[in-house]
A protein has these predicted regions:
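C-terminal auxiliary extensions adjacent to catalytic cores
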Residues: 374-434
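Short beta-strand to alpha-helix junction loop
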Residues: 99-118, 247-251
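Active-site-proximal substrate-binding core of FAD-dependent oxidoreductases
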Residues: 329-380
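Predominantly flavin-linked oxidoreductase catalytic cores and closely associated redox partners
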Residues: 119-266
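FAD/FMN-dependent oxidoreductases across multiple families
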Residues: 218-223, 232, 245-326, 343-349, ...
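Helix-loop-beta segment of a Rossmann-like dinucleotide-binding subdomain
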Residues: 88-109, 145, 240-243
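N-terminal Rossmann-like FAD-binding beta1-loop-alpha1 element of flavoenzymes
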Residues: 9-36
Length: 434
């Protein structure tokens, strides 16, 4: 397309992560001229490590994704853990059905993003790495391109996939600077281990792996949680904490991270490992609230982290699958706009329609109350200790007479200092939120 002399491309996509690459690829596949701009010298260089990718959405874009893409391991075991200072209560779930087709994989973005970029180039996308977009070109309220240094690049539509600190969304007036209660800070390490050592310690084999979601003393009482998952020859482990609660605690994010790695249940798993990577990253904590607002302007759509498509339910932390899903919804709306030659606000708002009809919009609505539920401090300070006390009462076989489990649980509850109404309230809130 791009036949008009004052237009360089049909679409300019800013950001070469999962969202930006998927959107650019799909639009090029539909026959449009697309420019993908990436700030890093190569795609993936600005992304911290990777994560657990619930990857079935990628089969819609790249059939055989889990076989062809540079993924680390397939997650067939999921563990939910309550961590206390001297105890570790763990629910360990394994299911062969999660293996074929692959439900979730671990990825390292330094490997995945370049692969996605290559796929984009094969589809006809012009990929421009090492370029920082400075501002939008706005004429009569319409976004018509971007400025990068002294250069102007014009297009019918701009797609912003520039991450959680999206200055494009801020410049367009879609987002203001996020309050700290909507942000979380993640601190992650990647620890290298020989493949056999890793597989023996984590009880995984072949291409399969395990992911842990942890809560409690792992964040030293700060609202948030911890994660740990196996890559091919490394383990990614870290904490994610709500920024306002972390600041109020007086703790440093790095100290909390180190506290997790030294826990008696964690340290042996990482013993003699080599630190391959360490870093911090801001993420969205209240994604459902953010994405409920505007995501478009005439000639502009916002996708992925830039729009707030992250979801933490306490059991799973999702971002990449939602990023890919939002990219597909945006590509559908932009394709319709290009076919009609209409780049008005109304045309861009078709993005919202496609979102609401997709699993992305439906899941964000389903878990809209999850962030508020996860703010409850008892989640991080009381329930882990209660669980440990109950199990201690069950498994501690001293010389005193045994009691029924119900009696053990009731006695542990009485000693916990929790009020019955608080537990009922939290339970009801959890049912509604999750």
């Amino acid at each position: 397309m791009a036949e008009e002399t004052n237009v360089d491309f049909d679409v300019i996509v800013i950001g070469g992560g999962v969202a930006g690459s998927v959107c650019a690829y799909k639009l090029a596949e539909d026959g449009h001229e697309v420019l993908l701009i990436e700030r890093g010298m190569e795609p993936g260089s600005k992304n911290l490590s990777g994560g657990v990718f619930y990857c079935r959405v990628m089969e819609q874009v790249f059939p055989g994704f889990a076989e062809e893409a540079p993924v680390e391991r397939r997650i067939t075991r999921n563990c939910v853990s309550l961590i206390n200072e001297e105890s570790f209560v763990n629910i360990d779930y394994w299911d062969r059905r999660l293996e074929e087709p692959a439900n979730a994989v671990t990825v390292l973005r330094a490997k995945l993003d370049p692969w996605l970029s290559e796929k984009c180039e094969e589809a006809g996308v012009t990929v421009m790495p090492g370029v920082k977009v400075d501002s939008l070109i706005i004429e009569d309220g319409q976004i018509v391109g971007v400025r990068a240094g002294e250069d102007e690049l014009r297009s019918h539509v701009v797609v912003a996939a520039d991450g959680v600190n999206s200055f494009i969304a801020q410049e367009a007036g879609i987002r203001t600077k996020e309050p700290m209660k909507h942000l979380a800070v993640g601190v992650k390490s990647v620890i290298g281990l020989p493949r056999k050592v890793l597989e023996d310690r984590f009880n995984v084999r072949g291409r399969n792996g395990v992911a842990y979601a942890m809560v409690g003393d792992c964040t030293q009482g700060v609202a948030g949680g911890a994660f740990m998952y196996t890559n091919e020859e490394s383990v990614s482990i870290g904490v994610v904490m709500r920024l306002d609660d972390l600041e109020a605690s007086g703790l440093s994010s790095s100290d909390v991270h180190d506290h997790l790695l030294s826990h008696p249940a964690i340290a042996p798993l990482l013993e003699d490992g080599e630190l391959l990577e360490y870093g911090c990253h801001l993420t969205i904590e209240d994604g459902p609230q953010m994405v409920s607002h505007d995501l478009t302007r005439p000639g502009l759509v916002i996708i992925g982290d830039a729009a707030g498509f992250t979801l933490n339910t306490g059991l799973t932390i999702r971002g990449m699958d939602l990023a890919a899903g939002s990219a597909l919804a945006a590509a559908a709306a932009v394709h319709e706009a290009l076919e009609a030659g209409d780049f008005s606000q109304q045309a861009m708002d078709r993005y919202r329609t496609h979102l609401d009809e997709s699993f992305v919009g439906k899941d964000m609505a389903t878990y809209a109350k999850a962030p508020a539920f996860l703010e409850r401090p008892r989640m991080y300070k009381d329930y882990g200790r209660l669980g440990a006390e109950i199990f201690y009462g069950i498994f501690d076989h001293d010389l005193t007479p045994r009691r029924h489990i119900v009696k053990v649980a009731l006695d542990a509850f009485k000693r916990s200092g929790l009020r019955l109404w608080d537990v009922i309230s939290d339970g009801l809130a959890g049912v509604k939120a999750l």
